[in-house]
Amino acid sequence: MSTMSIDTLIGHVTRICQKNGVAHLLLIGSFATGTARKTSDIDFAVKGCKDILKLEEDLEEIETLRKIDIFDYDSIKNKYLLENIDKCGKQIY
């Protein structure tokens, strides 16, 4: 496993999401708000993903020490979480 740069990691995630037909990819959490630490995981929200389990499996193939969390925006029921994603999320595509 490697300690790749965040930009490189986002590039890998972007390609995998596009391959899986994700309509929109957003960076959320501490990396989106600029509060990430050396040990922070990296969080994404996806919109328009038909098979979230396949996407998660494909993302597990990325060789990184950082944990990657994916949230399916379309299935989130918590309105406060949705508001936070809408307010603080950084759209990748």
Regions found by a protein language model. Give the residues of each.
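Catalytic core of pol beta-like nucleotidyltransferases
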Residues: M1-L26, A32-K38, K47-Y93
